């Protein structure tokens, strides 16, 4: 319905501004091509990052750069939940209920907590950053529903925090993208992004590193972004603002080839099970939390997803695993 009404408006020679990331991720390329044909504009700054002007930055300020990585905390609901879990020690269900009472989470929070919202946003941003067409359905996505209060205690012991990270990297004509909970160290610029705030990290071959930070949701930040697009449309009557999003497709790296360290929780006595763990995951670092008995954790070396899954299947009593990112 929304796609049809948007298409009719563009066909009638009217510019359209939207905050709907589902529509943009699914039909954005087609609608931009139609807008170009009709010499009008289809703008969607508010679809990613609320009031953070990341799309305009990618489309104008950073056009001299070849962007090879874009990643970020793109969902305020999940970031609020993970921040509260880390600070209060409460479990996921309790904090989700709190988020709903405060209006930070929908009655049906599935799109947020399962990572679908962040997935659509990183697909849009990747398409603009890489000048190609990245399909959100092809991005591996994992939500935060399995993150526990115990995971947070281990993260604290490691001097890290847990965030839902949307990450996309390009290497020549290949790219990899993933949305999943990760442990971040204090050296990460995203470590201190807390509450309902969002942040987008960009790396370009000329610019180097840059981070865009601000309110990722809410009526006023979204309204600010939509109003900015409306003004931009008014400034370009009869002229289409070119967007760096084409129908060219990059080769996607198989997720199982991607490498990083993993944090793993496992049942059992450390002294009894450690030889088995080290035989399976050599050179792993053991992590313990004094108040958690009958289990321990360990951090693996940097290995591929495929190798991790193969080795983890050999261990009984694995309670969970979280990727670790730099």
What spans do the regions from the language model cover?
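A generic structural signal for well-ordered alpha-helical segments
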Residues: 9, 34-35, 99, 155, ...
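Conserved active-site and cofactor/substrate-binding residues in soluble primary-metabolism enzymes
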Residues: 26, 49, 53, 65, ...
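A conserved regulatory-domain signal marking ACT and ACT-like small-molecule sensing domains
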Residues: 230-326
């Amino acid at each position: 319905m929304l796609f049809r009404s948007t298409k009719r408006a563009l066909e009638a020679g009217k510019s359209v501004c939207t905050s709907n990331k589902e529509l943009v991720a699914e039909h954005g390329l087609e609608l931009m091509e139609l807008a170009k044909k009709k010499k009008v504009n289809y703008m969607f700054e508010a679809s990613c990052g609320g009031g953070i002007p990341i799309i305009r930055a990618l489309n104008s300020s950073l056009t001299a750069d070849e962007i090879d990585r874009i990643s970020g905390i793109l969902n305020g609901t999940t970031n609020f939940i993970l921040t509260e879990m880390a600070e209060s020690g409460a479990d996921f269900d309790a904090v989700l209920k709190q988020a709903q009472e405060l209006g930070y989470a929908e009655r049906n929070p599935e799109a947020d907590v399962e990572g679908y919202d962040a997935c659509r946003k990183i697909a849009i941003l990747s398409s603009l950053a890489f000048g190609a067409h990245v399909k959100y359905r092809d991005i591996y996505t994992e939500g935060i529903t399995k993150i526990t209060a115990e995971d947070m205690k281990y993260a604290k012991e490691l001097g890290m925090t847990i965030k839902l990270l949307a990450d996309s990297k390009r290497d020549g004509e290949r790219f990899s993208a993933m949305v999943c909970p990760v442990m971040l160290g204090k050296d990460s610029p995203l470590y201190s992004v807390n509450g309902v705030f969002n942040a987008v990290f960009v790396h370009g071959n000329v610019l180097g590193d840059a981070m865009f930070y601000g309110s990722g949701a809410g009526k006023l930040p979204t309204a600010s972004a939509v109003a900015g697009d409306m003004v931009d449309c008014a400034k370009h009557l009869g002229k289409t603002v070119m967007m760096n999003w084409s129908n060219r497709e990059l080769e996607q790296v198989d997720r199982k080839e991607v490498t990083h360290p993993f944090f793993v929780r496992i049942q059992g006595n450390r002294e009894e099970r450690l030889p088995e763990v080290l035989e399976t995951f050599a050179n792993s670092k053991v992590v313990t939390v004094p108040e958690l008995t009958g289990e321990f954790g360990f951090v693996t070396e940097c290995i591929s997803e495929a190798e991790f899954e193969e080795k983890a299947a050999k261990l009984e009593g694995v309670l969970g695993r979280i990727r670790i990112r730099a």
